[in-house]
UniProtKB/Swiss-Prot annotation:
Protein name: Protein LRATD2
Lineage summary: Eukaryota, Metazoa, Chordata, Craniata, Vertebrata
Example of a GO cellular component annotation carried by this entry: plasma membrane
Record's compositionally biased regions (Acidic residues): 300-310
UniProt tissue specificity: Expressed in esophageal squamous cell carcinomas.
Record-annotated LRAT domain positions: 122-217
Stated family: Belongs to the LRATD family.
Extent of Pro residues compositional bias: 65-74, 289-298
Biased composition (Gly residues): 54-64
PANTHER family (UniProt xref): PROTEIN FAM84B-RELATED, PROTEIN LRATD2
Gene: LRATD2
Source organism, top-level taxon: Eukaryota
Amino acid sequence: MGNQVEKLTHLSYKEVPTADPTGVDRDDGPRIGVSYIFSNDDEDVEPQPPPQGPDGGGLPDGGDGPPPPQPQPYDPRLHEVECSVFYRDECIYQKSFAPGSAALSTYTPENLLNKCKPGDLVEFVSQAQYPHWAVYVGNFQVVHLHRLEVINSFLTDASQGRRGRVVNDLYRYKPLSSSAVVRNALAHVGAKERELSWRNSESFAAWCRYGKREFKIGGELRIGKQPYRLQIQLSAQRSHTLEFQSLEDLIMEKRRNDQIGRAAVLQELATHLHPAEPEEGDSNVARTTPPPGRPPAPSSEEEDGEAVAH
């Protein structure tokens, strides 16, 4: 809870869940990384979409001033951050807008239902909001972590008017069978607050599909190394890399970037980071290095409660 410091002195390196099975640490050089020490995430107090009128637009405000500007259609390429996640040298997650990549196209909740199969992971997205993840369990319903409780909802209700998509292919772990994914999700319906083992909807949904404890609170021990890397694509030829002690920490930073949006992330990096010379033989990617001691800022849109590990 809070700023607790974990006692690791009695553990050997072999007890660390993500240790290299060969026993060889390929990352012995100096490392710069970030690690969250606060305890709760985000989306349950996220700003809600404005009420919609019968034509899908906003309701009139009844004032005498000019009507508010019409909201622009949601475009993932404008609002979302293209990024990859690595555990050591293995890519375990990738969000790419490369030509021919249709997986990030979004659909209305009604159209999304036609694309879902039991066991699918669904992501609802909207500008300036945290992505909300859910597990489709069939019969037009999803199971998701919402307001510190795992609940079963109709997909259209869980969307809260946001567009969505199936995101089975973002994480590159081997998935469980569809029936096992549905079983995992349904088994935790009703769990809430201190019974929870996940900080956010993404970690819960991903755990249901892949069954990896790295998605759980405290699923990995922090031993001072940063084996996880979040590579943010700045442009076609430049990227910036942040390193993390755990997948849990990395997901929180990735979700913060999704919430503030691509333009804000690029502006933040331009303001706080300084370009470094590309390494020899690595001319296609310019790397940037965070100033010493710069952790990612916690989001102002945190949950109003805590989830704890068991």
